[in-house]
Amino acid sequence: MQKLIQGLGVGAGAALGVCVRLALTLWLGDSAWPILTINVLGAFLMGWLRPNAFWGTGFLGGFTTFSAMMLNDVSFYFFTAVGCILAWLAGDRLAR
């Protein structure tokens, strides 16, 4: 029963962390810099405060979003490469 209660606490902390991250992202803008700032702040707080499961795994785990940052990076590089290739092909076509 204690593991269930701890799991629910971690879930509640994660939900709270996600809400705070969303509010900050809406306020600061949805780009790489706010996400990077949130992740660095979350990692700093995790190391400095050494929080329990609710605040650490839950809140700070939901607050940080390393996977979303990686997805943004991969998407940026993929679409940049595809966009550059398509732009080059279009320019090459026009030159003929």
UniProtKB/Swiss-Prot annotation:
User: Sorted alphabetically, which keywords does the UniProt record give?
Assistant: Cell membrane, Ion channel, Ion transport, Membrane, Metal-binding, Sodium, Transmembrane, Transmembrane helix, Transport
One GO term in the molecular function aspect is: fluoride channel activity
* Cell compartments where the protein resides: Cell membrane
Can you tell which superkingdom this protein's organism belongs to? Answer: Bacteria
Look up keyword Acyltransferase and say if it applies: no
- Membrane topology, record value: Multi-pass membrane protein
Q: Which InterPro entries match?
A: FluC
What regulates the activity here? Na(+) is not transported, but it plays an essential structural role and its presence is essential for fluoride channel function.
Q: What are the GO BP annotations of this UniProt entry?
A: cellular detoxification of fluoride
Amino-acid positions noted as binding Na(+) in the UniProt annotation, renumbered to this chain? 61, 64
Q: Which reaction does it catalyse?
A: fluoride(in) = fluoride(out)
Pfam families this protein is in?
CRCB
Can you cite an annotated GO cellular component?
A: plasma membrane
Q: Which residues cross the membrane?
A: 4-24, 26-46, 69-89
Give the family from UniProt: Belongs to the fluoride channel Fluc/FEX (TC 1.A.43) family.
NCBIfam families named in the record: PRK00134.1
Question: What does this protein's UniProt record list under function?
Answer: Fluoride-specific ion channel. Important for reducing fluoride concentration in the cell, thus reducing its toxicity.
- In Swiss-Prot or TrEMBL terms, this protein is called Fluoride-specific ion channel FluC 1
Q: Which gene encodes it?
A: fluC1
